[in-house]
Curated annotation (Swiss-Prot):
It comes from the Eukaryota. It comes from Arabidopsis thaliana (Mouse-ear cress). Residues 1-27 form the signal peptide. Disulfide bonds join C50-C56, C165-C175, C275-C313. Residues 320-333 have a biased composition (Low complexity). Disruption phenotype: Ectopic accumulation of lignin in etiolated hypocotyls. This is Chitinase-like protein 2. GO terms for biological process: carbohydrate metabolic process; cell wall macromolecule catabolic process; chitin catabolic process. One of its GO terms (cellular component) is extracellular region. Glycans are attached at N65, N216, N252. Its main location: secreted. PANTHER family: CHITINASE-LIKE PROTEIN 2, CHITINASE-RELATED.
């Protein structure tokens, strides 16, 4: 027979094992965060480099800063996109916080949301998502919650009127027979050549399977962040560069009224489709409104957006012509 003290000890041991197992399971089910994990640090040629594990890995100076999950949590994502799963939305159950954070992890070592102090990171996330929200919204003037609450309502263009196949690129990015290259994703991708370039960057065959962007939310966010981080042409800056101050305007840029800030991100992404058309451009103002609204909801406040002339590209000469940019209309068309 087992003595009472020994039996009690066995029960305590079993209870402890069960408790620890339950704790591990709960930890795995919780949202990922790097805030409680100390980074690995090494010095290379006098420069401090860090690795924070899954969210910011690969020894980067940017990984020494706050990661996105440190300042942008699930509840904030839900606040920004509060109507995305409403019954009248067109991508119910598709978009979620985890997909965004997983996608962002690929680009945080490159500075996405991690270039500079925490405030700078919060502003960049709001700026990027401001573009996303405006391009995937089904909001309108009298919509419940207001027109700015309906971002991520779409994940694809609902009624495309063409296949968006440009035969000029038939040698480099040939169209797959019967496939439509209409808008899909968080920053909707259009045209065979854009699907081809994006697929090459993400190592996914989007040219043959553009539908992947409407089937996988993480991939859809990755494609959008890649576009945000990548110059549209070799001699141009990226939207990320012009927003975080990495881009330094030349004399020609200054003469063309192109200055760093949110307005320049619109210029990089959409060029002459939107910019240099005055302050009454509805599409431009819609993008700016989403950014300001998201700054408020994320906890930064629109007063941190800077002077009005830097918020828009109303009088900026375009970085690029429309031939290098996708259609500026969102995927709700």
């Amino acid at each position: 027979m087992v003595s009472k003290p020994l039996f009690s000890l066995l029960l305590l041991t079993v209870a402890l094992v069960v408790f620890q197992t339950g704790t591990l399971v709960n930890a795995e089910d919780s949202e990922p965060s790097s805030s409680t994990r100390k980074p690995l640090v090494k010095i290379v040629k006098g420069k401090k480099l860090c690795d924070k594990g899954w969210e910011c890995k690969g020894w980067s100076e940017y990984c020494c800063n706050h990661t996105i999950s440190d300042f942008f949590e699930t509840y904030q994502f839900e606040n920004l996109f509060s109507k995305r799963n409403s019954p009248v939305a067109h991508a119910v159950g598709f978009w979620d916080y985890r997909s965004f954070i997983t996608a962002a992890a690929e680009y945080q070592p490159l500075g996405f949301g991690t270039a500079g102090e925490k405030l700078q990171g919060m502003k960049e996330v709001a700026a990027f998502l401001g573009h996303v929200g405006s391009k995937t919204s089904c909001g309108y003037g009298v919509a419940t919650g207001g027109p700015l609450a309906w971002g991520l309502c779409y994940n694809k263009e609902m009624s495309p009127d063409q296949l968006y196949c440009d035969d000029y690129y038939k040698l480099t990015y040939p169209c797959t027979p019967g496939v439509s290259y209409h808008g899909r994703g968080a920053l909707p991708v259009y045209w065979n050549y854009n699907y081809g370039q994006t697929g090459e960057a993400l190592k996914v065959d989007l040219l043959s399977h553009p539908e992947y962007l409407e089937n996988n939310a993480t991939l859809a966010f990755q494609a959008a962040i890649w576009r945000w981080m990548t110059p549209p042409k070799k001699h141009l800056p990226s939207a990320h560069d012009v927003f975080v101050g990495k881009w330094k305007p030349t004399k020609n840029d200054t003469a063309a009224k192109r200055t760093p800030g949110f307005g320049a991100t619109i210029n990089v992404l959409y060029g002459d489709q939107i910019c240099n058309s005055g302050f009454d451009n509805d599409e431009m103002n819609n993008i700016v409104s989403h950014y300001l609204y998201y700054l408020d909801l994320i906890g930064v406040g629109r007063e941190e957006a800077g002077p009005h002339e830097k918020l828009s590209c109303a009088d900026q000469e375009p970085f690029s012509s429309s031939s290098s940019a996708p259609p500026s209309s969102g995927s709700s068309s």
